[in-house]
């Protein structure tokens, strides 16, 4: 942001500076002083400015009132706020300032106590409360309200703009409006953080685990080419907590699209459902293949082999660093996106030979504890399904019929169960050797999902496969599709009023069946 020519510029002659984050403070203070700007400051900020050899007036010298109550009261004084809030366009305001002996401020530079960071550090409630800034937001909001007369800056990233503006005669009105908008965003995000902590942790209204207030703030990171379809404008926003897919580092390739982001998000979640090296290949938010292996190259080979036709133009997520061996294989297949925590030596060189593949680095595993789903007039909030239910542990499963599986066989069935979580309901997944071999997803009845999974697997791979169903079989017909294809074992939640009929069908076919008591609908 630079000052532009125009008669609505406000020269900067006097500045109030009070910052917690002192990044770039000395250079800012020197630059303002060299430009003839008078500096007024508080506490440690004033001390840092003075230590840099820059003349500064302490705010208590201005107010005639000492800083008190362990720093809780510093700037809450009429001689400070009148100087910020005076609308210099009005003769009456200018006259009152003269009568009161108050000089106006042209620039306010303030950033706030690190409340969010203090909470994240595990600090005690009293320590968190102490980091609730009072004077800072008051000055920021006052200056932002009075943007016709005052420029307000809340980020060190703007300091270079400040110095350019000072040299150029001040910020024009359009720039002051933009700075005011940033300032209100700054205080709004701060207030949401404080209110959310009170509602969720410090003073919850009940023990439901869901706060009575739900607030969130996002900043626009990028305007996307379009949304799901060309007639839908779209943009990417990031949360102040940072990290995650929205702030992944793009190492190569074309700009990410809306659909790229939705598929990549689904792929990362699917890959991180597994503790072993895992690769998930996703198309339209559904798996083309999920596999685990001794290493990521093996996992990718098995995941791709599940459905090579659908994997063409897919999105790949890996829960380990990508090896050169895997990268060379991926480079030979048309792939929209690959995302991983990192890339080993030689992997990026192999991938970047393909001009258009988007290569992302997202070091941390998906960690959102809750999911928010907007609906008309409101939103739904639920705890994220991380396969954390008791029934996700095979040790808790109930053998409904058939011979108990060996440890190795049970591990195969457990893989199928975990992989099935990533499939849109109604979901049936067939697996062999730690890899999906047939996926039936998104059908409105379980019979069609079973048919689709068997069809995708083919007769040879379906024979002896391990099958998982995200919800119970309401009738034996869906199960009979699987047993007719020769599956070895089935895992499902159970709980249908017709469980006896379903168990009888499995028993008749000589198929082992386990009940988990846990469902994994996914919409």
UniProtKB/Swiss-Prot annotation:
Domain MGS-like: where? 1-154
What is the UniProt domain comment for this protein?
The IMP cyclohydrolase activity resides in the N-terminal region.
HAMAP family cross-referenced by the UniProt entry: PurH
One GO CC annotation, please?
cytosol
- Mind listing the GO biological process terms from this record? 'de novo' IMP biosynthetic process
Question: InterPro entries given for it?
Answer: AICAR_Tfase_dup_dom_sf (IPR024051), Cytidine_deaminase-like (IPR016193), MGS-like_dom (IPR011607), MGS-like_dom_sf (IPR036914), PurH-like (IPR002695)
Q: Which keywords accompany this UniProt record? A: Hydrolase, Multifunctional enzyme, Purine biosynthesis, Transferase
Query: Could you tell me which PANTHER family the record lists for this protein?
Result: BIFUNCTIONAL PURINE BIOSYNTHESIS PROTEIN ATIC, BIFUNCTIONAL PURINE BIOSYNTHESIS PROTEIN PURH
EC assignment: the record states 2.1.2.3, 3.5.4.10
Its family remark reads: Belongs to the PurH family.
Q: Name one GO molecular function term.
A: phosphoribosylaminoimidazolecarboxamide formyltransferase activity
Residue ranges crossing the lipid bilayer per the database entry:
none
Associated pathway:
Purine metabolism; IMP biosynthesis via de novo pathway; 5-formamido-1-(5-phospho-D-ribosyl)imidazole-4-carboxamide from 5-amino-1-(5-phospho-D-ribosyl)imidazole-4-carboxamide (10-formyl THF route): step 1/1; Purine metabolism; IMP biosynthesis via de novo pathway; IMP from 5-formamido-1-(5-phospho-D-ribosyl)imidazole-4-carboxamide: step 1/1
Per the UniProt record, the source organism is Streptomyces coelicolor (strain ATCC BAA-471 / A3(2) / M145)
Protein name as catalogued: Bifunctional purine biosynthesis protein PurH
Catalytic reaction(s) noted: (6R)-10-formyltetrahydrofolate + 5-amino-1-(5-phospho-beta-D-ribosyl)imidazole-4-carboxamide = 5-formamido-1-(5-phospho-D-ribosyl)imidazole-4-carboxamide + (6S)-5,6,7,8-tetrahydrofolate; IMP + H2O = 5-formamido-1-(5-phospho-D-ribosyl)imidazole-4-carboxamide
């Amino acid at each position: 942001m630079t000052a532009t020519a125009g008669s609505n510029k406000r020269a900067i002659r006097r500045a109030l500076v009070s910052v917690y984050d002192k990044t770039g403070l000395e250079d800012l203070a020197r630059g303002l002083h060299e430009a003839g700007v008078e500096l007024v400051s508080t506490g440690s900020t004033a001390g840092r400015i003075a230590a840099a050899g820059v003349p500064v007036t302490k705010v208590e010298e201005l107010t005639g009132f000492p800083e008190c109550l362990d720093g809780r009261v510093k700037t809450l004084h009429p001689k400070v706020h009148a100087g910020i809030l005076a609308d210099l366009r009005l003769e009456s305001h200018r006259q009152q300032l003269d009568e009161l002996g108050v000089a106006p401020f042209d620039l306010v530079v303030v950033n706030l106590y690190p409340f969010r960071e203090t909470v994240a550090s595990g600090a005690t409630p009293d320590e968190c409360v102490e980091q609730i800034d009072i004077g800072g937001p008051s000055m920021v909001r006052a200056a932002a309200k009075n943007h016709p007369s005052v420029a307000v800056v809340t980020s060190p990233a703007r300091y270079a703009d400040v110095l350019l503006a000072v040299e150029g005669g001040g910020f024009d009105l359009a720039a002051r409006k933009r700075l005011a908008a940033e300032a209100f965003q700054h205080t709004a995000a701060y207030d949401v953080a404080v209110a959310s902590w009170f509602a969720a942790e410090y003073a919850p209204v009940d023990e439901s685990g869901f706060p009575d207030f739900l607030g969130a703030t996002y900043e626009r990171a990028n305007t996307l080419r379009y949304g799901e379809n060309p007639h839908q404008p779209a943009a990417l926003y990031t949360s102040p907590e940072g990290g995650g897919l929205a702030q992944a580092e793009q190492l190569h390739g074309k700009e990410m699209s809306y659909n790229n982001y939705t598929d990549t998000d689904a792929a990362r979640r699917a890959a991180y459902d597994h503790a072993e090296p895992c690769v998930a290949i996703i198309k339209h938010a559904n798996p083309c293949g999920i596999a685990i292996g001794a290493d990521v190259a093996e996992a990718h080979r098995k995941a791709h082999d599940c459905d090579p036709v659908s994997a063409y133009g897919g999105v790949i997520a890996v829960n380990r660093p990508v090896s050169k061996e895997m990268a060379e294989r991926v480079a030979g297949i048309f792939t929209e996106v690959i995302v991983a925590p990192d890339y080993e030596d030689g992997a990026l060189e192999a991938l970047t030979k393909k001009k258009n593949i988007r290569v992302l680095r997202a070091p941390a595993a998906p960690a959102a504890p809750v999911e928010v789903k907007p609906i008309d007039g409101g939103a739904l909030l639920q705890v994220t399904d991380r396969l954390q239910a008791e029934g996700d542990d095979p040790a808790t499963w109930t053998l409904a019929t058939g011979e108990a599986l060996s440890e190795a066989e049970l591990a195969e069935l457990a893989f199928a169960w975990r992989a099935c979580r990533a499939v849109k309901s109604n979901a049936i997944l067939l697996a062999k050797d730690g890899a999906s071999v047939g996926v039936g997803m998104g059908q409105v009845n379980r019979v069609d999902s079973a048919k689709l999974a068997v069809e995708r697997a083919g007769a040879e791979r379906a024979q002896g496969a391990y099958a998982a169903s995200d919800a119970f079989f309401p009738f034996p017909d869906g199960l009979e599709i699987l047993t007719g294809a020769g599956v070895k074992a089935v895992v499902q939640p159970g709980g249908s009023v017709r469980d006896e009929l379903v168990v009888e069908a499995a028993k008749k076919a000589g198929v082992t069946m386990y009940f988990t008591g846990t469902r994994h609908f996914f919409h």
